[in-house]
Regions:
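Phosphate-handling DNA/RNA-contact segment within nucleic-acid enzymes
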Residues: 1-87
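TOPRIM fold recognition
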Residues: 44, 56-161
Length: 161
């Protein structure tokens, strides 16, 4: 894959290999749902991460009680929310990567997360992790710095009204 495209937001783009078109419909998939479905149903909650790696890291921490699934990007939609609600989910926590690097981008990113969650608040209770203290590096996932850091951020998450 072209490094320029990866560095500039193209890593989730469809690929053409020997004239064949390959794509993965991200808007219809939650990575890790097949493994974490029982824990999600038992706890009535799902934690949405951006990347598959986050779901795998959480699996190492929580094992059979892991409720983390990945949206494979920084968006989710009504289809995915309804899929979780059908499993009995009442609480959805968005745990996306830290994408703010200054006060202006912090406000923009906060508003983006808040409005994404608010859009679907009639389906479930929504909250999101937002690192106001810059504990995480820029573009780092809440799972990248260990379970203690994740749980600290989780306990300080923003609840959407």
């Amino acid at each position: 894959m072209d490094e320029y495209k990866i560095d500039h937001g193209g890593k989730y783009m469809p690929a053409y290999i020997q004239g064949e078109f390959y794509t993965h419909p991200l808007m219809y998939n939650l990575y890790g749902l097949n493994f974490n479905k029982q824990a999600i149903q038992k706890n009535h909650l799902a934690i949405l991460a951006e990347g598959e790696k986050s779901s795998l890291i959480a699996d190492g921490w929580y094992g059979d009680n892991n409720c983390v699934v990945a949206t494979c990007g920084d968006k989710f939609n009504k289809f995915l929310v309804k899929q979780l609600v059908k499993l009995g989910v009442t609480d959805i926590i968005v745990a996306y990567d830290r994408m703010n690097h200054d006060k202006i981008s912090q406000k923009v990113y906060f508003n983006k997360l808040y409005s994404m969650c608010q859009k679907y608040k009639n389906y479930a209770n929504f909250s999101f992790i937002f690192d106001t203290d810059e504990i995480l590096e820029y573009k780092a996932a809440p799972f990248d710095s260990g379970v203690e850091t994740f749980e600290k951020l989780f306990n300080r998450r923003v609840f959407v009204k």
